[in-house]
Amino acid sequence: MHQKRTAMFQDPQERPRKLPQLCTELQTTIHDIILECVYCKQQLLRREVYDFAFRDLCIVYRDGNPYAVCDKCLKFYSKISEYRHYCYSLYGTTLEQQYNKPLCDLLIRCINCQKPLCPEEKQRHLDKKQRFHNIRGRWTGRCMSCCRSSRTRRETQL
């Protein structure tokens, strides 16, 4: 049976949104902080805590307590969001014209792992004429890591 936790951050204005700020607020480090997944409530593995920070994801709060997301739930809910909330796709050049900004100035996350794409990953989409996808009003593409893993998966399925 779960014990009821006391809310850490009652005031929504004082809630840290990113992991480094949460660590500072709790006077701990990214190497020591213990977080649960907002979906499955399992404790994140240390690697998942590091991945959460690397992906620059936001901490969410339930009853004043901070939560992150584990890898399994992140990938699962990313796929659900893609299926339920896909709007449309555009080539990079069209996206730049639509926003009147270069791709490097636009936040585009990986459709699978939610990591922000780096300039090289965005350029790869341009070079290979791959589209970016608008899901729930946010732009997504594929990071190098997810591209490699999906290619490997396809090759082993043959």
UniProtKB/Swiss-Prot annotation:
<dbReference type="GO" id="GO:0042802">
    <property type="term" value="F:identical protein binding"/>
</dbReference>
<feature type="short sequence motif" description="PDZ-binding domain">
    <location>
        <begin position="156"/>
        <end position="158"/>
    </location>
</feature>
<keyword id="KW-0899">Viral immunoevasion</keyword>
<keyword id="KW-1119">Modulation of host cell apoptosis by virus</keyword>
<keyword id="KW-0479">Metal-binding</keyword>
<dbReference type="GO" id="GO:0039648">
    <property type="term" value="P:symbiont-mediated perturbation of host ubiquitin-like protein modification"/>
</dbReference>
<keyword id="KW-1048">Host nucleus</keyword>
<comment type="subunit">
    <text>Forms homodimers. Interacts with ubiquitin-protein ligase UBE3A/E6-AP and thus forms a complex with human TP53. Interacts with human NFX1 and MAGI3. Interacts with human IRF3; this interaction inhibits the establishment of antiviral state. Interacts with human TYK2; this interaction inhibits JAK-STAT activation by interferon alpha. Interacts with host DLG1; this interaction leads to the proteasomal degradation of DLG1.</text>
</comment>
<keyword id="KW-0862">Zinc</keyword>
<keyword id="KW-1092">Inhibition of host IRF3 by virus</keyword>
<keyword id="KW-0804">Transcription</keyword>
<keyword id="KW-1035">Host cytoplasm</keyword>
<dbReference type="GO" id="GO:0006351">
    <property type="term" value="P:DNA-templated transcription"/>
</dbReference>
<dbReference type="InterPro" id="IPR038575">
    <property type="entry name" value="E6_sf"/>
</dbReference>
<feature type="zinc finger region">
    <location>
        <begin position="37"/>
        <end position="73"/>
    </location>
</feature>
<keyword id="KW-1113">Inhibition of host RLR pathway by virus</keyword>
<dbReference type="InterPro" id="IPR001334">
    <property type="entry name" value="E6"/>
</dbReference>
<dbReference type="GO" id="GO:0039653">
    <property type="term" value="P:symbiont-mediated suppression of host transcription"/>
</dbReference>
<keyword id="KW-0805">Transcription regulation</keyword>
<dbReference type="GO" id="GO:0039502">
    <property type="term" value="P:symbiont-mediated suppression of host type I interferon-mediated signaling pathway"/>
</dbReference>
<keyword id="KW-0863">Zinc-finger</keyword>
<dbReference type="GO" id="GO:0032489">
    <property type="term" value="P:regulation of Cdc42 protein signal transduction"/>
</dbReference>
<dbReference type="GO" id="GO:0030162">
    <property type="term" value="P:regulation of proteolysis"/>
</dbReference>
<dbReference type="GO" id="GO:0045944">
    <property type="term" value="P:positive regulation of transcription by RNA polymerase II"/>
</dbReference>
<dbReference type="Pfam" id="PF00518">
    <property type="entry name" value="E6"/>
</dbReference>
<keyword id="KW-0244">Early protein</keyword>
<keyword id="KW-0945">Host-virus interaction</keyword>
<dbReference type="GO" id="GO:0008270">
    <property type="term" value="F:zinc ion binding"/>
</dbReference>
<dbReference type="GO" id="GO:0003677">
    <property type="term" value="F:DNA binding"/>
</dbReference>
<comment type="function">
    <text>Plays a major role in the induction and maintenance of cellular transformation. Acts mainly as an oncoprotein by stimulating the destruction of many host cell key regulatory proteins. E6 associates with host UBE3A/E6-AP ubiquitin-protein ligase, and inactivates tumor suppressors TP53 and TP73 by targeting them to the 26S proteasome for degradation. In turn, DNA damage and chromosomal instabilities increase and lead to cell proliferation and cancer development.</text>
</comment>
<dbReference type="GO" id="GO:0039548">
    <property type="term" value="P:symbiont-mediated suppression of host cytoplasmic pattern recognition receptor signaling pathway via inhibition of IRF3 activity"/>
</dbReference>
<feature type="zinc finger region">
    <location>
        <begin position="110"/>
        <end position="146"/>
    </location>
</feature>
<keyword id="KW-0010">Activator</keyword>
<dbReference type="GO" id="GO:0030430">
    <property type="term" value="C:host cell cytoplasm"/>
</dbReference>
<keyword id="KW-0238">DNA-binding</keyword>
<keyword id="KW-0553">Oncogene</keyword>
<protein>
    <recommendedName>
        <fullName>Protein E6</fullName>
    </recommendedName>
</protein>
<comment type="similarity">
    <text>Belongs to the papillomaviridae E6 protein family.</text>
</comment>
<keyword id="KW-1090">Inhibition of host innate immune response by virus</keyword>
<dbReference type="GO" id="GO:0042025">
    <property type="term" value="C:host cell nucleus"/>
</dbReference>
<dbReference type="GO" id="GO:0033668">
    <property type="term" value="P:symbiont-mediated suppression of host apoptosis"/>
</dbReference>
<dbReference type="GO" id="GO:0030165">
    <property type="term" value="F:PDZ domain binding"/>
</dbReference>
